[in-house]
Design a protein with these regions (language model features):
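Surface-exposed, interaction-prone regions used to assemble/regulate multi-protein complexes
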Residues: 1-163
Length: 163
């Protein structure tokens, strides 16, 4: 599929779709509240990726707690009930850091015609900074998250005036 859009325009379109799609995922509303908006997952580290032919697959990210100072980490897991297609590249044994993670409606891909896109199918695109990047396509996405102790403590502090 040919496009006259620049890479930046494609990224911005993907970001808009992510902003609309992510909050609709099961379990995402509380994470959106924590981040006071849809998280971009900028500088998040991919800590775990489980791909299964049958049953659930998942990706786990370690993301900064949403404050101006280093107040701990939030661990986000996106479960994929039915994995349809995978296109990944660049795994690094030391660290896998992403610029962004976007969830958006799945698009047809003539180059990778291994599946037929159905309504409700979603793509998870990993925009790599270092290491793993690529695309996961699936159905039945669900979001879960936890915080480390520092982030839990930070979440109990009253917000500072002017911030």
């Amino acid at each position: 599929m040919s496009s006259d859009k620049t890479q930046r325009e494609e990224f911005e379109d993907s970001c808009r779709l992510h902003q609309a799609t992510f909050p609709e995922l099961e379990g995402a509303a509380s994470l959106v509240r924590l981040y006071d908006g849809v998280p971009s997952f900028h500088d998040a580290e991919i800590t775990d990726l489980n791909l299964r032919q049958a049953g659930g697959s998942s990706i786990r990210l370690c993301n900064l707690y949403p404050t101006a100072v280093d107040d701990g980490r939030v661990f986000v897991t996106i479960e994929i009930a039915h994995l349809i297609d995978v296109e990944l590249d660049g795994y690094n044994h030391g660290q896998n850091v992403i610029n962004a993670l976007h969830v958006r409606p799945a698009r047809s891909n003539a180059v990778r015609d291994t599946y037929r896109v159905e309504p409700g199918d979603l793509e998870i695109e990993l925009f790599s900074i270092l290491g793993l990047g690529g695309l996961l396509v699936g159905r039945g996405l669900k979001v879960g998250w936890t915080m480390d102790r520092r982030a839990r403590n930070a979440s109990k502090r009253p917000a500072l005036l002017g911030q």
